[in-house]
Amino acid sequence: MKKTMSLSALLAMTFGSSLLMAADLPADLNWQSNLHEPRFASPQAKFGGTFHTYIESFPQTFRVVGPDSNGRFRPWLLDSRPSAVTRHPDTKAWIPDIASEWAYGDDNKTVYFRINPNAKWSDGEPITSEDFTFVLTFMRSKDIVAPWYNTFYTQQIEDVIQYDERTFAVVSGEKRNAEELMLYTNMRPIPAHFYRPKKDENHDGIQDNFVRFYNFKPEPSAGPYYVDDMKKGKSITFKHVGKDWWGYSNPYYLHRYNVEKIRIKVIRDKDIARQHFEKGNLDSFWLDTPELWREKTETANFEQGYIHKFWGYNQVPIGAGGLWLNTAKPLLDQLEVRKGIALATDFDGLIEKVLRGDVVRKPNPMGIGHGDYTNADIKAPSFDPAKAIAHFEKAGFSQIGPDGIRVNEQGQRLSFGITYSYGYLTPQIAYLKEQAKLAGLEFTLNLIDGSSAFKYVLEKKHELSFHSMGTAEIPAYWEYFHSTNANKPQNNNFTNFSTPELDRLIMAYRTEFDLEKKKVHAKQIQAIVADAGVIVPGYMRPYAREAFWRWLQIPQPAMTKSTEFLFPSGTFRDLGTYWIDESLKKETKAAMKSGKSFAPVTILEEEYKL
């Protein structure tokens, strides 16, 4: 029989930490550490160097909760920050993160965790059980002005129990099957020492003017990087804790997060950013459009092998998205109008003619890739102007104005603005606008700067919004369609749509223990949303597609099932498996000066292509 040693036991032997359990900790727990999943980083990785990238707008806050926090910069502050445990990117098994061991209680509600004894915040303070119990104090406080978190951590998390400095338990508010219990109880710690209030007149343990006080005060990081420098409106620099970062005592972190600094410059125009990339001022660039992958890479730097191209497929679950219709706005509360809009929106033509078939139509407005939770019977509506016109006429839009746009008897034009956040999307929205005219529908273009656009949508000011959301393994519906969030700002019910039947199903879905029944509820919810026509399904990219200078090195193969980005190209959602080879950087710079060239490189990885 193969003998194994848990990570906690190994660390205790190495560092002399005591692992004696508190007296009231259940004695019969089956502790797990799961150290035998395959590694996905390269032992050849080298530490050091500065990675240069860009964002199009400066964040409105460094908070990760409260007003304006759910913006495009948020992944930089969350996605590299560890939780108690994490999923292996290929096998999806739970593996250690901050916790070196975990155990399930026999009540179907409780999960116990032991913290890695080396775990520290970036400011040097140890990560303790208090940082997990503090999560409830923080997330339940009204001072953070985050109703969704207030509700979730009150209703879905019953308690967090501290046994000693390294041992704690999280108790779910409901009994849950093993598949989702860890998803609910797996927490990201919050540094209690950092948030100790200076003014707390309501005695809830949180700074009274939290939103303003912490707006640009980034919290210490449990991950490899922390905010080191900030020039408002211009740049942000993340710095690595160093080679002695506690995470490297976890074997799954070895050879990852290798660069010493990540410098992010604000460049408000994508074309200008691409020019900076071609000059070597940025290290990688996301090739999300057909032109960027094709014509824009037909330059000397690519042809002479200085810059490489990569296209690798993944199997990441896809979240809800496309055109979100705000039913609180005039006319959009009418089902016939919404059905007409769906049939007059030519996403299929957009994919074929503008995006050259590089992307795939999203069949389900609530996303796909959730296994048996996904309602495979739902199909995206095909472009059909004649059918769209029939719906518009049922809604009273039987007349056509001199500009070709339909009007009703009250003189209202069939016209709606599409809010979107990036200039490179303008040709796509313009195509939808031209095609919609065939049904007498007008789309106007409402381009708003990146972070401001999401704030605009969160405040429910939009008519139609073109955006997509991320998702978890088990899909969520409460935030999008429960009546609690309808017609209120700063939450994710972007459509302001809800019904009593949806409320009932959503609550049944949230509390259902039986997996098969839960999946039935999920499919019913998706069917109601699809029939309501409040989201016109957009498109999806099941791959990572980037360009990078040849001094950036990647594992072979580079892709896992969960790889969305190879590099932090404008967002921090990569797995940190790349590194900078300074000798290759010098070689490349010298070659460019002397005129020496290398073979052009295009890498295609299709192992996870569906």
Residue ranges of model-derived segments:
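Gly/Pro-rich hinge or "lid" segments in bacterial periplasmic/extracellular proteins
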Residues: 81, 86-93, 187-261, 271, ...
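Detector for C-terminal structural segments
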Residues: 27-28, 32-36, 55, 231-240, ...
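Ligand-site clamp/hinge motif
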Residues: 116, 213-216, 244-298, 433, ...
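Aromatic- and charge-enriched surface segment that lines or borders ligand/interaction sites
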Residues: 100-145, 169, 273-276, 331-333
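Extracellular/periplasmic solute-recognition and catalytic clefts
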Residues: 139-142, 146, 228-239, 265-329, ...
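N-terminal lobe/hinge region of extracytoplasmic solute-binding protein
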Residues: 25-39, 47-106, 137, 220, ...
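Surface-exposed binding/hinge segments that line
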Residues: 46, 150-204, 224, 229-231
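Alpha-helical secondary-structure segments
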Residues: 52, 128-137, 165-171, 223-224, ...
